[in-house]
Amino acid sequence: MYYIGVGIMEELYLRGLLQNIIEKWFGERENATLYAILITSVLFGLGHIFGALGQPIVTVIAKTVWATALGVYFGAVYVVSKNLWVPIILHLTINLCGIPFCFSTSNQYPAIALITCLVSYILLAIYGVYIIRKNN
């Protein structure tokens, strides 16, 4: 339940609230939407540092960069789809990939979790391309 609630709240707060506020704050400036996506994505990435604390610095940096890149993806999908439910569902899909890790006693993802994540990410990429093409 935690993974579901966190994903929904992050999207409501970062994309639904902050991204819109920042975009309006930049007003008619060129690239206002891009700036809003980038700022909220960096905040999203920084927010994920806490989940990586205690890991090697390379892992902390990788998770932060990965989360920032996902933030850009979620922000862009939100802008293109004009529907906050789309990034929420994408976010939940990614969060659910982490559930098998919760039941592992090692510091490594079980093979089934890696396969699940890989399949999910491929489907997310396909869906992202579909949304962009549909709206162009």
Model segments located where?
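Central hydrophobic cores of alpha-helical transmembrane segments
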Residues: 36-42, 86-98
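Alpha-helical transmembrane segments of multi-pass membrane proteins
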Residues: 3-7, 41-48, 71
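Membrane-interface helix/loop boundary segments of multi-pass membrane proteins
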Residues: 12-39, 56, 76-83
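C-terminal membrane module of polytopic membrane proteins
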Residues: 90-136
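Active-site His/Glu-centered metal-binding helix of metallohydrolases
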Residues: 8-13, 17-18, 22, 46, ...
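Interfacial helix-loop-helix junctions of multi-pass membrane proteins
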Residues: 49-65
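Membrane-embedded alpha-helical segments of multi-pass membrane proteins
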Residues: 1, 13, 64-69, 93, ...
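Hydrophobic alpha-helical segments embedded in the membrane of multi-pass proteins
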Residues: 45, 61-76
